Amino acid sequence: MSHPTTFNSHLWQQHRLAQQPIEISILLTQMGFAAKVLAREISRAALMGNLGLMGETNATGDAQKKLDVFSNQIVIDAFSNIGLVAVIASEELDQVKLIECGQQAQYILCTDPLDGSSNTDTGSAVGTIFGIYRRQTSGYCSTEADVLQPGTELVTAGYVLYGTSTMLVYTTGGRVDGFTLDPSLGEFLLSHENIRCPETGKTYSANLSYYQEWHPHIQNFADYLSDRKSHTAHTLRYSGALVADVHRCLLEGGLYFYPPTADQPEGKLRLLYECAPLAFLVEQAGGKATSGLARIMDLEVTSIHQRSPLVIGSQVAVNLYQTFLEQGKAA
């Protein structure tokens, strides 16, 4: 019987065999540690009185849950005092948070610490999204300018899914690997090696409650997917947690889309710490991610809480979405 590969031993192998910088391995190890703490705290939140609202909103206007604030602090603590992270940009912070100054602090962490936090009160799936960049400026201390980088500059990205099991999925480019937490060992074990996103699929994820606010050509696309009398019919699977829905697309194919609306013409999801990290990961697995008009990875970032539409998943499904958009523009 072969021994399972732990996340830390996998990272060491990547450093030794694939010349992955040791700093990246250290940063990913810290994310793994934060994920273990979050998995524990999320699972017992109801017992510890950590459910419900804080009574405040975050930088992007979302109502903050107690677990949002708690999760944000866990991630910050995990990356503080290791000497590698210069600043952190988070959904839960109005501005970037300065962590370390000096020549060793060459990395930028962008994160949504608790994606889908509206699910916490019902015990449904939630997640953590992260993306890491290198500093671009040469000053002693980093600035917000170091954070405003396109997805093409990511050095590593991934997510953690807290559901029926806790799973960490990440990429440093070239491949995507997934690890499942064994609670009895307290270790993430390699469970999904070299994940490849299917070219197509029969499920889609979208918040259809906004259907009336979508442009007509996007409505036509949704109608096409849901036509039960046609061979084009897809099954709707929408959880309210971006990580959970993208994870399904990654493993089973299909697509997730969150288009612009009249009230939110720039989209709802945040480019820097939601769209770009997931786009990088899905592309490395053979999938595709677009705003509907442009590749997510190429979009210019002008503010830390900048929003973007997102269409992500299988190549065929995302291309079909874009076909409907082109037909709408040509009409």
Swiss-Prot record:
What UniProt keywords apply to this chain's record, in alphabetical order?
Answer: Calvin cycle, Carbohydrate metabolism, Cytoplasm, Hydrolase, Magnesium, Metal-binding
**Which InterPro entries does the record match to this protein?**
FBPase_C_dom, FBPase_class-1, FBPase_N, FBPtase, Fructose_bisphosphatase_AS
The subcellular localization recorded is: Cytoplasm
One Pfam entry for this protein is FBPase_C
Which one of the record's GO molecular function terms can you name? magnesium ion binding
- For the ligand (Mg(2+) 1), the binding residues are E91, D112, L114
Provide the catalytic activity annotation: beta-D-fructose 1,6-bisphosphate + H2O = beta-D-fructose 6-phosphate + phosphate
| Required cofactor(s) | Mg(2+)
Write out the pathway annotation from the protein's UniProt entry: Carbohydrate biosynthesis; Calvin cycle
Annotated positions binding Mg(2+) 2? D112, D115, E274
The EC number(s) attached to this protein equal: 3.1.3.11
Keyword Transmembrane: yes or no? no
Q: What class of enzyme is it?
A: hydrolase
Quaternary structure, from the entry: Homotetramer.
UniProt-listed NCBIfam families: PRK09293.1-1 (NF006778)
Entry similarity comment: Belongs to the FBPase class 1 family.
Q: What is this protein called?
A: Fructose-1,6-bisphosphatase class 1 2
